[in-house]
Amino acid sequence: MYNRVYKERQEIRTIQGLEASGQFQTASNITDIQIYSINVTPTMSKGGETGETQLRRLMYLSASTEPEKCNAEYLADMAHVATLRNKAIGVIRFLLYSSPFFFQVIEGTDEDLDFLFAKISADPRHERCIVLANGPCTGRMYGEWHMKDSHIDNITNNPAIKTILFQIARSFTSMWSYLPKNAANMLLLGKNPNKQGPEPRSVVLTFIYLVEFSSILAHPGLTEQCADILAAFVEASVRNCEGTWGLVAKFITGTCVAYWPINRAEDALVGLQQLSEDLAVLRSYQPPGSALSRIYSRRGVHYGRALLCNAGFRKADFTLLGDCINTASRITSLSVKLKVPLLLSFEVRCLLGDEMREELERSALHKVKGRDKPVQVYQFNAPELDSALVRAKIEQFNPGRYRALCPVKPYESLHPAQRPPIFDDTPRENQPKLSQVQRRDSLVDRLSLIAKLAFPSSMMAGGEGQLITLTYISQAAHPMSRFDLASIQRIAFARNESSNITGSLLYVSGLFVQTLDDPKGAVESLYLKIRQDKRHKDVVAVFMAPIDERVYGTPLDMTSATEEMLATFPPLQDVLSQLAKSFISLETYVPSTVVRYLTAGNNPRNLQPVSVEVVMLATDICSFTPLSEKCSLTEVWTICNTFIDACTSAICNEGGEVIKLIGDCVTAYFAPTGADNAVHACQEIVSFSAQLRDAFHDVLDCRSVVACGVGLDFGQVIMAQCGSLRLTEFVVAGEVSARVMAVEALTREAGRAIVITEPVSDRLSAKLRDTGIVPCQEGLHAVLLWYPGPRMGIGCANHQEDHLRVPRRPGPGRHEEGGRRHQRPGPGRPRRGHPFLPQGSTTRPHQFSVQLHPLPKLGTGSSDGGIGVSLHVYSAGRYRQQLHRRQIAAGGQRRSVGPGQDVARATRAHACDAGHQAPDQPANAQYERQFRGGQQRWRTCGIVHSNAFVTGVGLVQQPWLDEGHRPEAPHQSLHPGPGDPSEQHPHRPNRATEPGLLVARQPAVCLHRPEGFAQICTF
């Protein structure tokens, strides 16, 4: 479609596309203009006065394999040979060389371009040809610009131009290996991945799991070798998947997702079986102590329809979406239960030939999570792969003195200049808050981090007065007329002159390139102000380095960079514009850590594998599996794209780092000090889901049912890059990576939208910890914590309330069986709330647990020294008090208690021996009768209420105590706060006068006998 522009009945221009027409109208400052649209048939591609048809323009970037030879003479010889060939076939080309990169634009017919580019790609003098643009053109833009000596030094001495060409090209080629394979293929075809619409495909999909990789991560002796394991797994997966005509979609923690076309089902199974054999060979050749001898894989294969699409905006992923992805994941999980290394669905079996079908063995119908109908699966005749045996081998594994090839080092042990930029620690408090629309198109500000990483020690020693140069690029928010540019130059010149800042500003086809020279403090301050300017967007700092003297002599040199230089070499503006746009587009697919490391002038291959503690976040859409079954592929894409957009924006706005986009699931991490930011991001995600449902409540739209759960956990992860130049992954892996998914799954069971664990709650600010958290009875085999607090968040369809909930985590001496047993409420107890508080009670309890330890007799090696008592008190979630072993004289009949044996759970205590009658119940105490092994046992719990605190008494029948025995005086409190902990608290009660009931100033542990109470210790 063409648009013909008329003014006063005279045609002044013909423009292709409505958008270009609007830009022309704005830039020309013409108000009385009329635009007419004309639809044109295939002759649209007819170009120029020569009558040529099917003209196309192709722009590519490549890296020289011989940069040391690329001098002026070398380029002149190359240009002479190319010019003769171009004239013979009627192709127009220009070449720009900026060491070590070639930029070339070719104009010609489809047939000529395909022939020429095939020969160019095979030329050994360069490598990694990346297409920046490839599309039809209406005419030859560069006229007779044949292959001239186009060395950058012969075109301009402008340092901004040289910097932008080198830095963007360098970052562009480095990011290539981090791109999803589909996005990289799009670029090779000259297409922008984030501009492509969803494309339905029939695929054979597989999930490849590293067996018991979480056990490897949890093994303290194998932490150093995790990077080696991941590197070997990534390399083997890429080699076998791509070697059988497949593509790797993504890598998750210890998981590879790959797919094949519908006609490559047999090749897919051959590749997966070969992967298992390669890992077996790898295990057999490992020296003693190598963790690679414990690497096994498990695969599940499914066939179905999926949508190849771009999901997300600020951080995006070019991936597959659809119900078949969820089913393939469930089938792989089912293989754990069936103890088989390879499991495939009935749909995959139908795609196989007769010969391979005969080798299959049916494994009957099985129910998988999230699906109403059972799934019929098949397997090959292969040895069993038992996860329990692999786990046992890993737990018993001793690495000895083996040293990893890529050792993982603690993050804190590295010098600040050597630490990878894994956290976005840009200070935001002093910067004006931006609206969501303003922040949407802006990339994460990396200025202060670049200053820490890229500057040498000599520059850091110079402080704020060190002279530096900063170059950034940005895109104009709207077309700039000559009056707009004149206004920018006038204001910037006056501002820079007053601040004694020099620099240059280049404007090319909607792209700004600016270089600033000044002391470090002044440049940083000005750059932060420039970022807030609404006249441009996508602000990216591409270069920052110390200099000895100023490059520019004026406050703002603008005209020489736009007119004189571009008049000398017109094609340069297209190179700059297309390269910058492609760089900004690709940055959304590459991890932020890699991008920050690149823009600081570093080689990402030198990123050091580190172990660091982080706050991990995981969120996904509730009931997504049945939702994907009932919705069309386009509706699934709409739901995921909308949800991922909101999640990535909320996470990045709070300083978090997005790790992976896994279908409807988003994982991210925050710094150890960013627990509050993580909670705020959770609240924003939940609020968005609720607002989205409200917005589409009365409209028949699939987004009206979007509800989500969010989980937070804290733990150590390994951050390392794995793979090769073909495909590189920046991996964030750790035991917490799997655990946070289980925490997020608790949102369905608990009926809450946000669930956090105890370590996260310990790192929250006092305001959030004391007023924003409520207890969670469901948990992960751990001690319950109870926090009062108001409701937080917005209600959603699958959740009764949206609270921050704290699940249980493993404590010393606790067992999974016991933890699961006590998760269920007993008869007559409420499902939620404190199991021993009266209904409606608002009293804040102390949560405590009691443990008994056998102690040796003083001065001897005998174990008849008595019982040690440990009381763990969690006071309102703010601190933890712990009293370790307390010596008690032994006497009478002693019960056998193993080391660390848990004899009390939360606020309950076990009875020791059978045959004793339950004592009279003290006030507010509840008794529970249990039958174990045919014997009656009583367990007693007492909770005494006060205004704001609760004094807990753990009661245990102990017949072995001597009659009339009284223990020593109480220990002093371990209260971490200032002042004497034994002082009377205004809200704590005095000792009670009721007979048989101890009410202490501090929480106390008591042992109960039928004759009365004996205090052991208080604190």
Curated annotation (Swiss-Prot):
Compartments reported by the entry: Cell projection, Cilium, Flagellum
Top-level lineage group: Eukaryota
Domain BLUF: start-end pairs: 55-148, 467-559
Any one GO molecular function term: blue light photoreceptor activity
Example GO biological process: cyclic nucleotide biosynthetic process
Family matches, as Pfam families: BLUF, Guanylate_cyc
GO cellular component, one term: motile cilium
Signal peptide: none
Keywords carried by this UniProt record: Cell projection, Cilium, Flagellum, Repeat
Domain Guanylate cyclase: 204-332, 615-744
Record family assignment: Belongs to the adenylyl cyclase class-4/guanylyl cyclase family.
Extra facts: The ST- strain is deficient in phototaxis. It is not known if this is due to defective adenylate cyclase activity or defective BLUF domains in this protein. In wild-type E.gracilis, photoactivated adenylate cyclase is found in the paraxonemal bodies (PABs). PABs are absent from this strain.
Record-given protein name: Photoactivated adenylate cyclase subunit alpha-like protein ST-
Organism of provenance: Euglena gracilis
